[in-house]
Amino acid sequence: MKVRSVVFLGVALSLAGCGGEHPLKPAPLALTTPAVLAQVHAAADSVEAAGAGLRLGTDLWRDFMPIAPPDGEPLRAVLLITTADSSAFPPALRADAAWVLKGDEVWATWVKETRPRLPGAPTLEVYAEGGPKWGPGIEVDVVVRLRDAADRAWYLRAREQMIHRTD
């Protein structure tokens, strides 16, 4: 019995450690406070952070492939934060959260980097999954929060982004 308990505990702790700094899970209330949402709604289409001009691109989709549920999988998002002049993305910046806005509805979520950063690359790529079942075929606004080593925050917006469908 002790051996089984120890093995179970080891597996549980291993799984709990998966996902890095912000495992993809429902966003805490901290991402939806009135103060944070005011920053989200005021987000600019481009920002200057850590000496670089930055823009946001997105790839939003819902999966309707045959193995998906009949009403499709929840929304997934890849967010590409790119330097305006194609210079190296500032290494001190990280993205920690994102919001997808559909009218008065908001999906707030943690994001995580999808792959290791390449030195000199102009883009930071982050990912989120488990969103609402909006669309496909509708436009939404997307906001990402960037932070630096001093924990200063910048909010960057991409307007009218299409939610696509995969079949």
Put a short name on every predicted segment.
Residues 1-7:
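Bacterial N-terminal signal peptides that target proteins for export
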Residues 19-22:
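Bacterial signal peptide processing site
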Residues 53-84, 90-91:
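Contiguous beta-strand segments within globular domains
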Residues 77, 82-109:
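Mid-length scaffold segments of soluble, non-membrane domains
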Residues 84-87, 104-154:
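Short, solvent-exposed, Trp/other aromatic-anchored flexible loops in extracytoplasmic proteins
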Residues 14-17:
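C-terminal motif of bacterial Sec signal peptides marking the signal peptidase cleavage site
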Residues 25-49:
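Post-signal peptide N-terminal segment of mature Sec-exported envelope proteins
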Residues 151-167:
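Short beta-strand elements
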